[in-house]
Each structure stands twice: as C-alpha cells, then as structure tokens.
Amino acid sequence: MSCPIDSKKLEEICLEAAQPVLKASEYDGDKTAEMNQSVIYAVLNALNKETQSYKWIVSSTLVQKLPEDHPSRGVHAAHAACWNCEKDGMTTIKESGEAIDVVLSIMWISI
C-alpha cells in the first residue's frame, strides 16, 4: 500500500527532522544516540499530527561519510513484517549532509 501521507509531505517531514544532524560538519560517535533519538521523535510527532488513523514505526540510521580518498563505508539494513498489504506498508527515505547521511525507515499499520 502507498503511504497514507503524500510522498512529498513525507519527504519534507524527514528532511526537517534530519536538518540538525545534516548540518553537522563532522561525525561525533558520542552524540549519535541523542541525534538518532531527536530525528525519530521529530518524525513521529509530525506523522501523528498528519493522521492518527495509523500506528507509526520509525527507525533511523546515521552513516558517517568518509573523505573521498577513503574507501566508502558499507552499511546494510533490512526490515520485515507480517501485516495486511492492503492497509499497511513501509518506505525508506535517505537525506544527505556534509558529514552524515540519515536513512529513515517509516512503517505504517492501520488501526
């Protein structure tokens, strides 16, 4: 099923939530838990304002960008669920900053 929120609106929500992280000029491993938490809660709050007809699940992955002369850092993530394919679904959105990429997985489950 397609997302119950327009894809452009969903992209705006994710970009706005990720902006503070994307503005970072360097990756600070000591702050990643706090950064992830702030992004997730910002997305969840915005989604709940848009519609309360769904339960929302948001996961966030922060990926450190490395210098061009350094080999690319590999990251792999996977999600699976059992649900009603006509009413429930998921999507992934990636936002890129100078030092960090933010990958958000958003799942919706009808109530």
Swiss-Prot record:
Annotated keywords: Cytoplasm, Cytoskeleton, Dynein, Microtubule, Motor protein
GO biological process, one term: karyogamy involved in conjugation with cellular fusion
Record flagged with keyword Disulfide bond: no
Pfam families named in the record: Tctex-1
Record-linked PANTHER family: DYNEIN LIGHT CHAIN TCTEX-TYPE, T-COMPLEX-ASSOCIATED-TESTIS-EXPRESSED 1/ DYNEIN LIGHT CHAIN
Entry's family note: Belongs to the dynein light chain Tctex-type family.
Name under which the protein is recorded: Dynein light chain Tctex-type
